């Protein structure tokens, strides 16, 4: 739904929109099949999810720490376990059986904050790179009018 009120998470990297929500929580959403198999989104609030998108919520540890741990550990697990059918997919046990080391809260927070800082900086640098590319294209067009 183009002007839907709530994000609708599918196996794509970016959510679509929908008019109804099924969840009102803080969650990690993991693509369970297709080209983006294992892609992890984080969301807090009201949303809906496609049937092949795993919704992980109600964490007793730092959810951001878990997100970063999954970004490292899940691709390795997927490489071993994914189905090689026409559409690759994972099953719930792929996630449930994953062993994530859980350090103390202080270390979890430190790791999560550090990774979020790197992610923000990377995002800023990518945006700056995009601006430089646009400026370069503009200047080239001006030079060859």
Predicted features along the sequence, with ranges:
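Short Ser/Thr-interspersed hydrophobic loop/turn segments at strand-loop and sheet-helix junctions
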Residues: 5-39, 44-53, 57-59, 66-79
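Amphipathic alpha-helical coiled-coil/heptad-repeat segments
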Residues: 99-145
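Short, surface-exposed acidic/glycine-rich loop or hinge patches that mediate macromolecular interfaces
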Residues: 60-61, 105
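A short glycine-rich beta-alpha junction/loop motif
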Residues: 47-53, 83-106
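Short coil/turn segments at secondary-structure boundaries
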Residues: 1-4, 82-83
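Hydrophobic side chains in well-ordered alpha-helices
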Residues: 65-66, 111
């Amino acid at each position: 739904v183009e002007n839907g009120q709530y994000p609708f998470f599918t196996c794509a990297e970016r959510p679509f929109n929908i008019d109804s929500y099924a969840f009102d929580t803080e969650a990690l959403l993991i693509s369970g099949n297709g080209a983006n198999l294992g892609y992890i989104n984080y969301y807090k609030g009201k949303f809906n999810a496609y049937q092949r998108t795993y919704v992980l919520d109600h964490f007793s540890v730092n959810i951001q720490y878990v997100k970063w741990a999954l970004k490292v550990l899940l691709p390795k697990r997927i490489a071993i376990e994914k189905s090689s059918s026409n559409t690759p997919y994972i099953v719930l046990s792929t996630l449930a059986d994953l062993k994530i080391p859980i350090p103390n809260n202080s270390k979890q927070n430190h790791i999560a904050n550090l990774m979020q800082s790197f992610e923000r900086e990377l995002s800023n640098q990518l945006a700056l790179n995009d601006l430089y590319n646009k400026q370069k294209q503009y200047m080239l067009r001006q030079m060859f009018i």
